[in-house]
Amino acid sequence: MASRAPLRAARSPQGPGGPAAPAATGRAALPSAGCCPLPPGRNSSSRPRLLLLLLLLLQDAGGQQGDGCGHTVLGPESGTLTSINYPHTYPNSTVCEWEIRVRTGERIRIKFGDFDIEDSDYCHLNYLKIFNGIGVSRTEIGKYCGLGLQMNQSIESKGSEVTVLFMSGTHAAGRGFLASYSVIDKEDLITCLDTVSNFLEPEFSKYCPAGCLLPFAEISGTIPHGYRDSSPLCMAGIHAGVVSNVLGGQISIVISKGTPYYESSLANNVTSTVGYLSASLFTFKTSGCYGTLGMESGVIADPQITASSALEWTDHMGQENSWTAEKARLRKPGPPWAAFATDEHQWLQIDLNKEKKITGIVTTGSTMIEHSYYVSAYRVLYSDDGQRWTVYREPGVDQDKIFQGNKDYHKDVRNNFLPPIIARFIRVNPVQWQQKIAMKVELLGCQFTLKGRLPKLTPPPRNGNNLRNTTARPKLGKGRAPKFTQVLQPRSRNELPVQPAETTTTPDIKNTTVTPSVTKDVALAAVLVPVLVMALTTLILILVCAWHWRNRKKKTEGAYDLPHWDRAGWWKGMKQLLPAKSVDHEETPVRYSTSEVSHLSAREVTTVLQADSAEYAQPLVGGIVGTLHQRSTFKPEEGKEAGYADLDPYNSPMQEVYHAYAEPLPVTGPEYATPIVMDMSGHPTASVGLPSTSTFKTAGTQPHALVGTYNTLLSRTDSCSSGQAQYDTPKGGKSAATPEELVYQVPQSTQELSGAGRDEKFDAFKEIL
């Protein structure tokens, strides 16, 4: 049929598994611009007219015809076509005609990615014509020419058939054209030359036509890291495995900030080159079905991997070497699987235990520098039962798909299945190899569910040379392939295929979109283990919290409850139980303010001293004799012990002429504060007679005043006959208090308080304490 002719143009005749060079047949018939010059004086338009007449005679062949056809892929829904030698200058006196057909009832949309045809003769000899229909009944849509012509508007046909005619005469410049087409409902059609710079949105979806694997284009990057912004979108989509070169398809693009470096890799017959810093990059949104299926991770067990034969031999050191099927695990150290025989009937088979969705395959060679073996081309077969096998083909193509393999012994090469394979068994059949058949494999895909199941590939019946009839059937009962144990004799190098001179270096291809699929047991363990860990952790936390709460409750019940204590009084009592700071015994004498003490009677003072221990003299606890350090009556320095503030023991306003703390006297001789002398022997309420006591430090030559118990406190008189006063006395007083009124032998102010006033003062003093 004529609809298959474009595929013949896109795929030249080739050997087993050899990659096709686009439009090789058309290029072979191309006359050079300089090899066949026109005779002098003859009309230069005579040759194109003869070629046009030849095309009319060959119309029944369909597809593309002529010597002016360039890169061409005409698919059932979309395609791409270029003039010969594009993007370089097309030759003189060439002609090409393309016949495009889509499904009946559909219309065709044509869009130009580049148009550069010389118009020096006003489209007389150099032009491009588009017709509705095919054959003699076709009608012209338009005739186009011009250098750098911007054809932003697409051209639409009236029916499902279109003819495109390119004609060139004598010209000096012009690249020709590149055009893409699709059915009319693909409104977001783009051409194979579009890049992200043609779009302003950070995310968008477009339709790529078939045939965007351009021989002259270049991409940089890989999936999933991203592609450089200069890369053509559709060609990068073929490399990533999201669209097919034969079918085209929809792509979803996400633009992000660029990176300083872009990796190189080989995938789907597209080699991406190393790229450097760019302003932006783009990635593809995919279904996520690109995880590894278990060859590398070990989810696929050794008995599930079989082969037609295995290479086993004993080397000159007597060591046995076995390159069996289970060694064909990608990225596993050690030797690969290698076939004992070297023919096209060898295979490596993988059993997935159940049907899965297989979207790709990654292969590598022997990975051993001393054994440079690899498979350069192979077929892929699939089966549901391991008995009836189907060779993978692309939709609409009546030939087996030959996948490009490795070009060296250590680089990974990825190939994607578009559409994906739904099967349990996968078999790899090498058709070309270097020296020996040796490879490591990993399958890409995901779990398959019956909901939304894709139809299986059902290519047309094969002829008599079907691989199914010539390939050994696997022994599923034993689960192992036959082994050959005889010693391998070295073969001469002239019997081996010649290694290609040109090699393409590709880095490791990483497909990390989806985690590897696992079996039911592994999936069950992956669910149960986290649940058990969380349950045990919760139980331990509950026990720890209960133990902590119980201990805290016990401590709370045993603690002292002091809600009614006054904070200042409680702290003063606690200070007596704490060791005092060691201070120098020879402190500077201080003046002690007795303005408030003068208002207290002997009974009141005795009560206060019984309720609150002395501030400056610490009693001995439990009758133990010890040395108590002296307390200082100086005003504490600011900033020192900021967290502690000692309350005023009298807690009453002071007269303005005095300080809140005792201040040192500016005298040379030693002075001491007036002692507080108590005579408890005559107190009516006292049950035990107490001698007179003093809480102040004695002179330096006297024994320490606080050695022993409270029964040995010192006292002294208020006599001041010497030239220097030994105790501080108030100045400016008019009269002194009588001994009958006060027990303390201290100076008093001129104004005496009445008995009622003193009682009120003492009540306020007790309330503050």
Swiss-Prot record:
Glycoprotein listed as a keyword: yes
InterPro entries: CUB_dom (IPR000859), FA58C (IPR000421), Galactose-bd-like_sf (IPR008979), LCCL (IPR004043), LCCL_sf (IPR036609), Neuropilin_MCO_CoagFactor (IPR050633), Sperma_CUB_dom_sf (IPR035914)
Transmembrane segments: 524-544
Sequence ranges assigned to domain CUB in this UniProt record: 69-184
Pfam families hit by this protein: CUB, F5_F8_type_C, LCCL
Glycosylation sites: 92, 152, 269, 469, 511
List of residues that carry Phosphoserine: 601
Disulphide bonds in the chain: 69-96, 123-145, 212-234, 289-446
Gene Ontology cellular component list: cell surface; plasma membrane
Domain of life: Eukaryota
Cytoplasmic side: 545-769
Subcellular location(s) of the protein: Membrane
Residue span of region Disordered: 1-26, 455-512, 718-740
Domain LCCL positions: 184-282
Domain F5/8 type C: from-to ranges: 289-446
Composition bias, Polar residues: 463-472, 501-512, 718-727
Signal peptide bounds: 1-63
GO biological process: negative regulation of cell growth; wound healing
Record keywords: Disulfide bond, Glycoprotein, Membrane, Phosphoprotein, Signal, Transmembrane, Transmembrane helix
Protein name, per record: Discoidin, CUB and LCCL domain-containing protein 2
Species of the source: Mus musculus
